Every structure is written in structure tokens, then in C-alpha cells.
């Protein structure tokens, strides 16, 4: 897919947010609604307690979860307003390589499940030198993060 000028702008903003991450793999995410950015974030080490569904049983906070969490709390738990907003929201998900360029940024299984649960309208990401735009309900992945794989292996010891 070739990004429009507006999509290119949003994806660039997402990539800029990825550079703020202190993690080994730097991910960023921008949420847009009505052509405007409504939330932005990047992946971080988890440094707070879990009081919501976005951070339970996790050692880090993914960029997508950071953004969904911000939208959720922005609406003060007003479910009707959240549902209406999420149904019209597009997430631009990026990953910044060591040389500063965009690299594979498809959401992991856990993030995709949360994106689907919150009825996000579209996701845009970079994979194998191409950009993709999907309705999250039409997208499937088996991608697990290194952290998830490590935690799974620990539970089998």
C-alpha cells in the first residue's frame, strides 16, 4: 500500500514517538480520530501497578496498549463515548530500527486481541518494506514478543 500524504504524516509522528522509547525494540503508536491525533505513545518498561486490563501480567507496556490506555482514561471510563470513539479510530503502529528507519511493526497477538476487543476501525503498520492497512478483525497474527515467549517458558519450568 502507498500511504497518502496525511497517512505518511501520521506514520512519521508514530515513528518519532518510537525514538523516545528506552527499550531495545523501539515501537511507537498514534491514534487518529476524525483526521486528528487523539493519543500517542511508545513502549516502556512497566513502572506502575496494574489497575486496568491493559497492563495485567505484563513486564512492559507496548505502544499500542499505551495509546489504548490513554484513550480509555481520557474518557473517564464512559463506555458509550469510548465505543463511539474507538469505532472511528485508526492506529498507526511503527518500529524504529537502529539506523532510524521504519521496520517491521505489525502488532503482536496480545495487542491485536486488545485492539479487536476495543473495536478499533483500522491499523496501519510496516512489514517487509511495505505498509499495510487492515480492519483489525480481518487481520490475524501468531507473532509473540520475546517477553511473552520468555514468560511462557518460565511457567513451564
Where is each model-derived feature located?
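Short beta-strand scaffold segments in enzyme catalytic cores
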Residues: 26-41
Amino acid at each position: 500500500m502507498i500511504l497518502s500524504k496525511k497517512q505518511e504524516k501520521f506514520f512519521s509522528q508514530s515513528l518519532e514517538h518510537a525514538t523516545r522509547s528506552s527499550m531495545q525494540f523501539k515501537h511507537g503508536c498514534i491514534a487518529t480520530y476524525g483526521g486528528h491525533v487523539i493519543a500517542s505513545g511508545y513502549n516502556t518498561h512497566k513502572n506502575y501497578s496494574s489497575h486496568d486490563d491493559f497492563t495485567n501480567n505484563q513486564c512492559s507496556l507496548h505502544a499500542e496498549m499505551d495509546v489504548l490506555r490513554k484513550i480509555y482514561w481520557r474518557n473517564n471510563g464512559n463506555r458509550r463515548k469510548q465505543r463511539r470513539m474507538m469505532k472511528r479510530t485508526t492506529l498507526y503502529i511503527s518500529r524504529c530500527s537502529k539506523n532510524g528507519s521504519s521496520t517491521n511493526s505489525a502488532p503482536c497477538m496480545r495487542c491485536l486481541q486488545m485492539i479487536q476487543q476495543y473495536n478499533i476501525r483500522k491499523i496501519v503498520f510496516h512489514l517487509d518494506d511495505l505498509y499495510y492497512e487492515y480492519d483489525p478483525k480481518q487481520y490475524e497474527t501468531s507473532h509473540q514478543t520475546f517477553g511473552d515467549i520468555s514468560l511462557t517458558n518460565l511457567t513451564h519450568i
